[in-house]
Amino acid sequence: MAFGPMMRLTTDRGLSVELAPFARDNLNVFVEGFARGTVTQYLSAHRVQTIETEQAWYDEMIKNKTSLNWGIWAVDGDKRQLIGNTALTEITKDHVHYATSGIVITDKKYWGQGIASACHRARTWYAFENLGLHRIKSAVIHGNAASWRALEKCGYELVYTERNEEFVNGKLRHMDCLECLNPADWAWRQWWGDDRPPRKSLEARKRAQAAVDWARQNVTLE
């Protein structure tokens, strides 16, 4: 389960992207990206990585049976460039099926182009419609407004806030813990049972459904 299947998609700005496996030989992309403090400042482990630490991570990742990873590849004609990765980790299929999502785009020239939002929608669609998950969890450090907006647009909502979770740029930062619930009727009924969903969850459900609908139209599963 180390890598998820290839998905091809086009962003709202017309950029071609592939979510696909990457090789050990591709890890320099992450070493170079994680050398920049602006890339790592809002990551839980904001440390510079070396090729040795990235290789150790890769070797563990490909053996992990509870995670699915995708490289984020920018495609321009016949050229493919690895610019980051996204993942579903801690995939659990007990009485409730859930996972934790994450993403990083290490090449800064691809920031602000809607790539993360498109990847969120593709990953969410795959998690709900192909893995049958009820819930996806994520977290955002305060100050990382772009990540918050991208996740919210995809159907994530705030569950609770961990105070003073990280120290970033000279100050303590809180961390918002988020969730995205599967909007399908069967999953929604199982999750809420006899409880009445609050208004914010109903609004998030509409956004999650819109994300899934977008992916159905714009994502090709290879």
What are these regions (language model features)?
Residues 1-36, 69, 77-222:
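Acyl-donor (CoA/ACP) binding surface of acyl/acetyltransferases
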Residues 59-71:
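A short helix-loop-beta-strand connector motif used in the catalytic cores of GNAT acetyltransferases and
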Residues 33, 37, 61-64:
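Generic N-terminal helix/loop capping motif
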Residues 38-59:
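Conserved GNAT-fold acetyl-CoA-binding loop/helix
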Residues 53-57, 71, 100:
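Generic beta-strand or strand-like secondary-structure segments
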Residues 49-53, 61-63, 105, 195:
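Juxtamembrane/interface motifs at transmembrane-helix termini
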